[in-house]
Design a protein with these regions (language model features):
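Bacterial N-terminal signal peptides
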Residues: 13-30
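Class I S-adenosyl-L-methionine-dependent methyltransferase module
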Residues: 45, 49, 55-66, 70-217, ...
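Class I SAM-dependent methyltransferase Rossmann-like catalytic core
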Residues: 197-263, 281-285
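Conserved Class I S-adenosyl-L-methionine
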Residues: 346, 458-490
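A short acidic, Gly/Pro-enriched loop at the edge of an enzyme's catalytic core
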Residues: 404-416
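A short SAM/SAH-binding and catalytic strip from SAM-dependent methyltransferases
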Residues: 414-428
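A short glycine-rich, Lys/Arg-flanked "PGG" loop and its adjoining helix->strand segment in the class I
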Residues: 431-443
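Conserved beta-strand signature within the Rossmann-like core of class I S-adenosyl-L-methionine
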Residues: 443-452
Length: 507
C-alpha cells in the first residue's frame, strides 16, 4: 500500500481460475491447543439476512429481493476479472522496477505514465483522459510505449519463457493468461497491460490534479478505484494506525475498569501481501504478508488478549495471500523482513510515534535480528523478525469475498480489521460488505478500518455497526508534505451509549 493521507487508496488480487485454488484453505493448526481452522463455514449473502436499513439503501439503487441473487453473481464475476487485472498490474510494476532479470535502470511507474501520455495529441488526451467520474476505455497503440520501457518489457517477456528461481517470476510464469504463449504473444499481452495500467496511473496521479476543488478530485479518484483491479499491496506502515486504534480501545477499557480480555477472536479482511507494489519494489526480499503478525503483536503488547487465547483468522480474495499465511507456521525459518517503506529524511522526518511503533514492532511475538540493507535504502528502518511458533500457529487464512460471503463460526468475532479494502467497493458493495461484517461480529464487537468515504458512516449505521471514534496519526513530515493515516472504530450494538466491549458477548 502506498501512503498519502487518511483514507487514501493504497492498495489487496488473484488468478482467473479461482475454483482450482479453493482447496488451499486452512491447512494450519500448529499447536495442540489451537482453535479450529479459519471460517468453519462460508455462506453466500442472502437478501433476507440484510438489516432493514441496508435493504432500504440498496432499494434506492434498484437492488431488491427479486434481483439480489443476480446482483451477487454479477459482483462475483466482476471480482474475478478485477483480480486478474490486479495481478497484471503487479506484473507491469515488477517488469518496470525489478533488477532480478535485467541490468537496465529501474523505471518509476508514475513517471512512465506521465511520459507515455506526454506523447498523445490533444484529441487523444481528451478521449483517453477525460475527467469524468466514469472514464471511458482508452486504447493507445503499443508503438507509443517509450523505448526504455519497451526494452524492459521485451526482456521480461523472454524471461517468462525461461527457467527461473525467483519466486515472483515463477508466479507470473504460471498465470493462466500467459502460460504456453510465445515470446511475441507474451510481449503483446504485457504491452497491452502496461498501456492499461499507465492510463490508470496518469488519471490518478495527474488528471485528478486538474480539478479546482479537493472534493471533486477525491470523487474522481474514488471512482477510479471502484473500477480498477484488486491489488495486494501492503507496507509495514499500515500497522501504525491500527495499533493506535487498539491503544484507544485499551485505554477506554482501563478507564472503564472493564474486566477480562475480550478481543481474542479476531478477523482480518484483506491482509494483503508485499509482492510487486507500484513504487519502492524490494525484490531482494521474498513476498510477505505483515498485517496479521503486526495485529497479533499489538493485541499482546496492549494486553487485549492472552497468548493462549489468541485466534487470528484472515480472509482474502487472493489465494497467494492465503497460501503464504497458512504455510508460514510450517517453515523451519519463520522470519519476516520488516523494512519501512518510508525513508527518515530531514525534509520529511518520520514521526516520533511511528519510529517508536517500528522499534517495538514484533517484540511481543518473536525475536528481532539485524537486517543489512542495500546502500540506497540505509535511510529506511529495518529489522528481521523471527516469529514464535506458538504465535504463527494461531494465524489461519481462507479465501473469501466479504462482499458476497460471510464466515459462520461457533463463536462470532470480537474484532474485525479492514484496511485499504473498502476503497475498491462501490456503494452497493460497501453496504453488502458492512452487513456481512456485522453478521460476523458479536454484540459489542468492534470494527476498525481506515476508509474516510463520507457515506460509510450511514452505511455502517444501517448495518448495525455505528462509528464510535476516529483518529488521525502522523507517519512522517513536519508542517508541509506530511503523511497521515487514520483509523475509525465502530461497534456492533443496539445501545448508542455502549462504546466498549462488555458483558453483551455472553462470555
Amino acid at each position: 500500500m502506498r501512503w498519502q493521507s487518511f483514507g487514501s487508496v493504497i492498495t489487496t488480487t488473484i488468478l482467473d481460475k479461482l475454483s482450482v485454488l479453493l482447496l488451499c484453505v486452512c491447512l494450519l493448526c500448529a499447536s495442540a491447543n489451537a482453535q479450529s481452522a479459519c471460517c468453519a463455514q462460508i455462506t453466500a449473502t442472502q437478501y433476507e439476512s440484510l438489516e432493514p436499513g441496508a435493504r432500504a439503501l440498496l432499494s434506492e439503487i434498484g437492488i431488491g429481493a427479486a434481483n439480489f441473487a443476480l446482483t451477487i453473481d454479477a459482483i462475483n464475476q466482476q471480482t474475478q476479472a478485477r483480480l486478474l487485472e490486479g495481478e497484471m498490474d503487479h506484473l507491469v510494476f515488477f517488469a518496470l522496477q525489478s533488477r532480478r532479470f535485467t541490468s537496465r535502470a529501474a523505471i518509476e511507474p508514475a513517471l512512465s505514465a506521465y511520459q507515455l501520455v506526454a506523447q498523445l495529441t490533444p484529441e487523444e488526451k481528451a478521449r483517453c483522459l477525460n475527467t469524468e467520474n466514469q472514464p471511458p476505455p482508452c486504447q493507445i497503440v503499443s508503438a507509443r510505449i517509450p523505448e526504455a520501457e519497451a526494452a524492459r518489457l521485451r526482456e521480461f517477456a523472454q524471461v517468462l519463457r525461461q527457467k527461473s528461481d525467483d519466486e515472483r517470476i515463477q508466479y507470473f510464469q504460471n498465470l493462466p493468461a500467459l502460460r504456453n504463449l510465445s515470446d511475441r504473444k507474451i510481449y503483446e499481452r504485457v504491452s497491452a497491460e502496461y498501456l492499461r495500467a499507465m492510463t490508470f496511473l496518469y488519471r490518478k496521479e495527474f488528471a485528478a490534479k486538474s480539478f479546482l476543488h479537493d472534493q471533486e478530485a477525491a470523487a474522481y479518484v474514488a471512482a477510479l478505484y471502484q473500477q480498477r483491479g484488486h491489488s495486494t499491496d501492503t507496507q509495514v506502515e499500515a500497522g501504525f494506525a491500527i495499533h493506535e486504534g487498539l491503544a484507544a480501545v485499551s485505554a477506554r477499557l482501563t478507564a472503564e475498569k472493564s474486566e477480562g480480555l475480550l478481543l481474542d477472536n479476531v478477523l482480518i479482511i484483506g491482509p494483503g501481501m508485499d509482492f510487486a507494489p507500484r513504487t519502492d519494489l524490494l525484490d531482494w526480499v521474498p513476498p510477505q504478508s505483515y498485517q496479521p503478525f503486526a495485529v497479533a503483536d499489538s493485541l499482546l503488547k496492549l494486553k487485549l488478549v492472552a497468548p493462549d487465547r489468541l485466534r487470528l483468522d484472515c480472509v482474502d480474495i487472493n489465494p497467494r495471500v492465503v497460501d503464504f499465511l497458512n504455510n508460514f507456521a510450517r517453515r523451519n525459518d519463520r522470519k519476516l523482513a520488516l523494512v519501512s517503506g518510508l525513508a527518515d529524511r530531514t525534509e520529511r522526518p518520520l514521526s516520533a510515534g511511528y519510529k517508536n511503533y517500528f522499534t517495538q514492532l514484533g517484540l511481543s511475538i518473536g525475536q528481532p535480528e539485524s537486517l543489512r540493507l542495500p546502500i540506497d535504502l540505509r535511510a529506511h528502518s529495518a529489522k528481521l523478525l523471527r516469529v514464535e511458533a506458538a504465535i504463527a500457529g494461531r494465524i489461519h487464512a481462507r479465501q473469501m469475498n466479504v462482499v458476497t460471503q460471510r464466515c459462520v463460526n461457533a463463536a462470532p468475532y470480537d474484532l474485525v480489521i479492514v484496511t485499504n479494502v473498502f476503497p475498491y467497493f462501490s456503494s452497493a458493495e460497501l453496504a453488502l460488505a458492512l452487513n456481512n461484517i456485522a453478521a460476523m461480529l458479536r454484540e459489542g464487537g468492534l470494527l476498525l478500518h481506515n476508509e474516510s468515504r463520507p457515506e460509510l458512516a450511514s452505511l455502517a449505521q444501517a448495518a448495525g455497526v455505528p462509528a464510535i471514534q476516529s483518529r488521525t496519526v502522523l507517519i512522517a513530515g513536519a508542517q508541509k508534505n506530511s503523511l497521515f493515516d487514520g483509523v475509525a472504530i465502530h461497534q456492533k450494538t443496539r445501545i448508542a451509549t455502549s462504546v466498549i466491549p462488555g458483558s453483551a458477548s455472553g462470555r
